[in-house]
């Protein structure tokens, strides 16, 4: 069975991976995909679909997912509530207006900058576990990020550190 598939940088416009149910790594970065169905790939741990033209992405069946890199697409919605094993989420440079990572208690890296966020829910209790966090360049609509420990977040995540834009509170 195919376990890893790397087809990045190939100008692909479509790809059917539904028969590859044993995949644990799928890298389709830098293609021209407008859609991709990974609902049958329930063993996926590492999924990289950055630099495509994806308008939607359903990862609800990919509960083993640890890394999701879906940056530079056209995503308006990203539901990662079922992805409780997720440690690395990079969804920067999309069109997301809301992001809820409150179910993702194992996150150590969250890159959600260059979106149109008005709501960011990080009430997952892992505030100090994040070694990489960037929610900048979301315009002026994001004014408050939901966290469990606002005092810690205020002291450690600042605009000077490049974590948030000026004026954002917790």
Residue ranges, per PLM feature:
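Leucine-rich repeat
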Residues: 1-2, 19-23, 40-44, 61-65, ...
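Short intrinsically disordered, low-complexity coil segments enriched in acidic
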Residues: 1-10, 147
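Conserved hydrophobic beta-strand positions in leucine-rich repeat
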Residues: 5-7, 24-28, 45-49, 66-70, ...
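Consensus "Asn ladder" position of solenoid repeat domains
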Residues: 10, 31, 52, 73, ...
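Leucine-rich solenoid repeat scaffolds
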Residues: 118-170
